[in-house]
Amino acid sequence: MSLAMRFWTLVVNALCIPMHIIKALGLYEGYKRVFPIFLQRISINYNKKMHDKKAELFRSLSEFAKPGKKLTLLEIGCGTGANFEFYPPGCKVICTDPNPHFKKYLDKSMKQNDHLTYDQFVVASGEDMASVEDESVDVVVCTLVLCSVEDVPQTLREAHRILRQGGAFFFMEHVVADPSTWVHFFQHVLQPAWYYFGDGCEATRATWKYLEEAGFSELKLRHIQAQLMFMINPHIIGYAVK
């Protein structure tokens, strides 16, 4: 299967040559303006299918607030604010995303989720959140984002830096499938096209390995099969404590 996988990956890569050229010319940036429209629709469907899993994951968020104080939470790659409904009442939310075109969707989501306190929207990548102080938040949330960042280890280092001691990094990410499966085969074959469709998304990352090496004192992680499009069925879910 490895030889066939390499061959068909090359075929798909060749078909994507026009997209490679568009990106090289700097024209791909225009897609970032319309990507929030697609993501909003995708997020609604994702939340319907993953509602119970998200509710289960975020149920323990409040446990990481300082005694007698409300939770301070920073979300990396907040997108359209699809996670807001799962955050506890009174939670102070700091939103970050490298795409400034999400802002109007984010504002709408904040109005719909008035049980939260909206702190600020920071246009920043997960790899560089220099404007956020060290050990300043109780929780960092990252869902369907580590598949798209350019540097996973650096993003996790930044999350670790801004978390206070005893704080937690919550995650829900799609990952590469087991090598013995056809899902693994198609993830690799379709990856060249998937990258452009998903605004830099990579379906072939073994993200759990980065989490295991990120230096957290405790890691609670489990693999699940989400009932989604086959390319993103394999998921990891859990949290890591600083």
Where are these regions (language model features)?
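C-terminal alpha-helical "lid/dimerization" subdomain adjacent to the S-adenosyl-L-methionine
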Residues: 21-34, 38-51, 172-234
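Conserved alpha-helix/loop element of class I SAM-dependent methyltransferases that forms part
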Residues: 45-72, 82-86
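A short SAM/SAH-binding and catalytic strip from SAM-dependent methyltransferases
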Residues: 138-151
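A short glycine-rich, Lys/Arg-flanked "PGG" loop and its adjoining helix->strand segment in the class I
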Residues: 153-165
